[in-house]
A protein has these predicted regions:
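Short, contiguous clusters of charged residues that form electrostatic/catalytic patches at enzyme active sites
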Residues: 28, 188, 192, 468, ...
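Residue-level detector of flexible, active-site-proximal loop/helix-junction positions
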Residues: 135, 152, 462, 525, ...
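Active-site-adjacent beta-strand anchor residues
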Residues: 76, 131, 518-519, 544
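Transmembrane helical cores of multi-pass ion-transport proteins
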Residues: 1-429, 434, 513, 533
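Short secondary-structure capping/turn micro-motifs that flank functional sites
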Residues: 336, 525-526, 545
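Generic hydrophobic alpha-helical segments
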Residues: 86, 166, 470-474, 550, ...
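Short acidic-hydrophobic, aromatic-tinged amphipathic segments that line or gate anion-handling sites
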Residues: 537-553
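The feature marks cytosolic C-terminal regulatory regions of anion transporters and related permeases
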Residues: 367-537, 555-558
């Protein structure tokens, strides 16, 4: 396998870079940086870390993904998909555990790219992607209920699970702070209607500016102090991040490895999906393996500076494209804009109401929910609906790690079932039409099957799901012929169970004085059977290139 085909798009685009392209990238980068600001703060807080860590992630990961990535226009940073995972890790293992899990996920992503496995991600069934994306959306919405309504739990700890959260919400719903509810609803309305007036100015930024000013006035001049702001819960730091090496131990690595796999898989899916969507708009074609290496590098470096997991962000990538972003330079400028905000304007973030950020995340969860797609998938075959619903409910009730693992297992089982259903095993009893496709030599007459000969045709892969089906087909006939011809011209591959099945069949047939003859074996299957040693048992004289030769061989055996 060829490895390490690493070609960052930045370096190829700079060869013919012009002043006009730079000005276009500059404007796009500034706008994307402004769009990313409220999202980075909201994602950081919702994940259970301080707001500046969300911005640090957007800065470092955004810079690295643009510098090393395989897409011209991809914008990286924290996303809503990781909120649930990050929050769960911090609750159970603390921020040190989050650093370890993110580092391992970064290594896994790099390995996926190095060994050119980016295409494998595309084979994850769509119902699984929609199921866990919609499940994450519901979970994000659930985590924001307390801030939307300003609930007071009286020191009672909010459970981490979905059902536990709703139970405590209902128990304390009489503590609703209606000022918080008004702030959240107003924020949602502003975000929803802003695109009608301006496509370029992000609604989330307008909502934060308008609502923050309004709440500041209410607190300062009307004496309303019941609306919590970021400054009421966090100490805002306005300084450049410094690297810190985490303490690693084997027990933590073992415990967090499944979570790291989830982060890597989710990050790979979201980043490649974002890059694919961008390709559809720009007409470009991204390098998925280079993109995965860049994503992995970002997740390897970002946590050392206190950041959280990052990936390609569809909304910010589309904002980049729509505002004229042409090359990775736009993504680098977006990171620089955020760095300047962190260094010089971060203290202003303390005045942002928590209820306003909750409103921002409600819109994020709505956009993530893909409810129209979810509804459409419910009309698909029952197997797809089963995968969709199981992944969805497991994501909500348990966690994303379990949802992805179980969803993939179920999808594999259903896939094998479909292959079994499409693979046909037929019995040809009397004669074979000479016009019957490929492996018959030129012949004008029908090929007569002699008495004492059975011809079986397998149409499809010969793997462990089909072996039993073949045995059942032979058992139904109940005959004991002298020769069994197995026509394998339409068998694309055979696995170990298929080889074992053929070996068992051959040994059993030899005991019953029945000869097995193979016909029309393709080159790939031929090499597999030869390498396994099966031909030594069968006898090379019983391997025939087509059905004509196989029938002649059968006549020799009978006579």
């Amino acid at each position: 396998m060829k490895v390490l085909d690493f070609k960052p798009r930045l370096f190829s685009t700079l060869k013919n870079y012009s002043k006009e392209t730079f000005m276009s990238d500059l404007m796009a980068g500034i706008i994307v940086g402004i769009v990313a600001l409220p999202l980075a703060i909201a994602f950081g807080i919702a994940s259970g870390v301080s707001p500046e860590k969300g911005i640090i992630t957007a800065i470092i990961a955004g810079f690295i993904i643009s510098l090393l990535g395989g897409s011209k226009v991809q914008i990286g940073g924290p996303t809503g998909a990781f909120i649930v995972i990050i929050y769960g890790i911090i609750q159970q293992y603390g921020e040190a555990g989050l650093i370890v899990a993110t580092l391992m996920a970064g290594i896994l992503l790099i390995l996926l790219g190095v060994f050119k496995l980016g295409a494998i991600i595309k084979f994850i069934p769509y119902p699984i992607i929609v199921g866990f994306t919609s499940g994450i959306a519901v979970t994000i919405f659930t985590t924001q209920i307390a801030d939307i309504f300003g609930l007071n739990f009286g020191g009672e700890k909010v459970p981490g699970d979905f059902i536990g959260k709703w139970m405590i919400y209902f128990r304390h719903f009489d503590t609703v702070n209606w000022w918080n509810a008004v702030v959240s609803i107003l924020s949602i309305i502003i975000i929803a209607i802003t695109p009608r007036f301006s496509k370029k100015i992000p609604g989330s930024l307008i909502a934060i500016i308008v609502v923050t000013i309004g709440v500041y006035v209410l607190k300062t001049y009307a004496g309303i102090d019941s609306i919590d702001t970021i400054g009421d819960r966090f100490t805002i730091k306005s300084e450049s991040p410094e690297p810190a090496i985490p303490t690693l131990n084997w027990e933590a690595i073992k415990d967090l490895f499944p979570v790291a796999i989830t982060i890597a898989v989710l990050g790979a899916i979201e980043s490649l999906l974002s890059a694919t969507v961008a390709d559809g708009v720009t007409g470009d074609k991204h390098d998925s393996n280079t993109e995965l290496i860049a994503q992995g590098t970002a997740n390897l470096i970002t946590p050392l500076f206190g950041g959280i997991p990052a990936t390609g962000a569809i909304a910010r990538t589309m904002t980049n494209i729509n505002n004229g972003g042409k090359t990775p330079v736009a993504g680098i400028i977006h990171a620089i804009v955020l760095l300047l905000i962190l260094l010089f304007l971060m203290p202003l973030a303390q005045y942002i109401p928590m209820a306003c950020l909750a409103g921002v995340l409600v819109i994020v969860s709505y956009n993530m929910s893909e409810w129209r797609t979810f509804k459409a998938l419910l009309k698909n075959p029952k197997s797809d609906v089963t995968v969709l619903l199981i992944t969805f409910f497991l994501t909500i009730i348990f966690d994303l790690t379990i949802a992805i693992e179980v969803g993939l297992v179920i999808a594999c089982i259903l896939f094998m079932r479909r292959v079994m259903e499409t693979t046909e095993i037929s019995v040809i009893k009397d004669e074979i039409d000479p016009n019957d496709e490929l492996d018959i030599a030129v012949c004008e007459e029908h090929l007569i099957i002699p008495a004492g000969v059975e011809v079986y045709e397998i149409n499809g892969p010969y793997f462990f799901g089909i072996a039993t089906k073949f045995e059942e087909t032979m058992a139904q006939l109940g005959d004991r012929p002298k020769v069994r011809i197995i026509r394998m011209r339409k068998v694309p591959f055979i696995d170990s169970t298929g080889i074992h099945n053929l070996t068992s069949l051959c040994k059993m047939s030899q005991k019953e004085k029945i000869t097995i003859v193979l016909s029309g074996v393709n080159e790939k299957v031929h090499k597999t059977l030869e390498k396994s040693g099966f031909y030594e048992l069968l006898g090379k004289q019983n391997i025939c290139p087509n059905i004509n030769v196989a029938l002649d061989r059968a006549k020799e055996i009978i006579n």
